[in-house]
Amino acid sequence: MLKLFKFLFLISSLYFIGCSSIVNKKNAQLPNNKTYAIGSFWNYTETPMAGLRAASIVESVVAKEGIQLLSLIDGDEKNALSQSKLAFLTAEKAVAKTKGANYLITGEVQEWRYKTGIDGEPVVSYSVKVIDLNTNNTLFNAVGAKSGWGNKSIGVVAQEIAKELIPQFIN
C-alpha cells in the first residue's frame, strides 16, 4: 500500500511540474538605479491586445521592485499591426531613448487563451527581453509558459510568470 501511495505521489508531482516552464538563455544582473522603459509586447496570438495586457502585467511587477520605469504602453494595437516587428521595435527604442531610458523592456506573446473544453484552463506563454539602449544588445532574454486550473484567470497566470521572470534580472 505504501508503494502504491509513493507511486501515485510521484506521478502527480510530475504532472504538476509539467504545468509551467521558465527558460532563461541569457542570465543578467542589471542595476536597479537606472531608468527602464517598458513598451508594448509583440502579439503573435489571435487574442486582441494580448501584447498590451502582458506588457501591463510585467510593468506592474517591475514597478513593485522599486525600479524607475517609463511606460510606453499606449493601449493601441493598431499601430503595431500596420508595421513590421523590426519597425515596431525600432520605434519603441527611439521613443525610450528620447525619454532618457537606459534599458528597454519588451517581449512577445506566443499564447494567451483559454483551452477549449469543459475545464477552459488558461494558457499563457510570453517572453521578456531587456535591451541596452546604448549598445543595442539584448542583455536578458527569457520565456515563460504556464497553464492554470479552470478557476484561474489568464491575468493571474500571466502574473505568476512575470513574478518568476523579473527577479532574474533586477539586482
List PLM regions with ranges.
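N-terminal segment of the mature soluble domain
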Residues: N32-S40, T45-K99, N137-N141
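Short, aromatic- and cysteine-enriched interfacial helices/patches
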Residues: L2, S21-V23, I170
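Bacterial Sec signal peptide processing site at the extreme N-terminus
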Residues: Y15-K34
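Solvent-exposed loop/turn segments at secondary-structure junctions
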Residues: N43-E46, D76-N79, Q110-K115, K146-W149
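Short, highly charged low-complexity linear segments
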Residues: L70-D76, T98-N102, I161-N171
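Surface-exposed short loop/turn segments
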Residues: Q83-T138, K163
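Sec-dependent bacterial lipoprotein signal peptides
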Residues: M1-C19
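Short secondary-structure boundary motifs at beta->alpha junctions and helix caps
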Residues: E121, S125-S127, I131-N171
